[in-house]
Amino acid sequence: NMSHEIRTPLNAIIGFSSILAETDDKEEKEEFVKIINKNSDLLLRLITDILDFSKIESGILDYSLADTSLKEIFHEQYQVHALKMPEKVSLICDFDALPDILIHTDPKRVTQVISNLISNAAKFTEEGSISFSYRIVEGYVLIEVIDTGIGISLQHQQSIFDRFVKINSFKQGTGLGLTICKTIIEALNGTIGVDSRPGEGARFWFTLPYNG
């Protein structure tokens, strides 16, 4: 129910904003601000997914290609997501191991896909780590996001990139994020996939063309 998905974080933002205005306790204020920020991020992702999916359905999702530094995108995404990780989860990226390369692609859309995969991993990982990296394989770049979360059954893997499919119905989200990721990567002449076993985490990966 899309309206329910939107109302849930919106109600949290409104409710905790009202409480925040009434409390003088510093620790309570800090906790309420965190809750408001978390739900604001969720609401933004929900709205972005809905708008992008609408553009996909209309055939007007835009792309703008440019020479792009993947390492810069990875640095930015680490800064964005590191402080948002669950309490017992570490975000890991070995920047020294990342090759300094430029690929001709859409930096905005590639960033969107990486951000979505990291956010998804955080949603289903209660403890352990989420690592993301890329490496050059002949003819393309392979980008990976690997987590130590709950894992995904083979049944779900076969439909996970379909629209409105959710791994866990109790988790918030539109069920459109991975559909949008697949559409973007295929439009950029790449492929996307997942490898996982229940209880053993998941590895999401995608490729982008690279000519050296």
Name each region found by the language model:
Residues 38-43:
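Short alpha-helical segment of the dimerization/phosphotransfer core of two-component systems
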Residues 15, 152-164:
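Short conserved segment of the HATPase_c
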Residues 15-27, 31, 35, 83:
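Conserved C-terminal segment of the DHp
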Residues 121-122:
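Short helix-loop "hinge" at the ATP-lid/N-box region of the Bergerat-fold HATPase_c
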Residues 54-65:
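Helix-loop junction within the histidine kinase core
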Residues 177, 181:
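Short alpha-helical Gxxx[C/S/T] motif in the catalytic ATP-binding
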